[in-house]
Amino acid sequence: ALVCKQARDLGLSIPLFGGDGWEAPQLLSIGGAAVEGTYYSTHYSPENKSPAVTGFVERFKKRWNNEVPDAMAALGYDAAMVLADAIKRAGTTESAKLRDAIAATKKLPSVTGDTTLDAQRNASKAAVVIAVRNGEFKFVEAVAP
């Protein structure tokens, strides 16, 4: 937020782009008008209208007194789904077989985007783009790799 304010104070009027730490509400309260029109990438947006996201949001709100799930909730859910899928494919919870099944995860439908693990076990999935518009975070699009 402070970098955005400084950029605006220096006369920079270009759109600014940040990472997933920008989703903190303090960005809006501290940055004010300086963050208007900025963008950031993250893992998830409850505004995404994909069936996986809308179903997750509905179930979460029903379970947690109408609270809207944040990115950490979505990532935690997806991690549990990767594990459940790997257990099912491995047919066991034996550690070596489970490790291999997790490593073999490919295009698993997920709330944060279809998940594929590469040879180094890094997740490859969509990046979600959010814009700050009228003082609010707004979903723009999910960009698949």
Regions of interest found by a model, annotated:
Residues 1-145:
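Extracytosolic ligand-binding ectodomains
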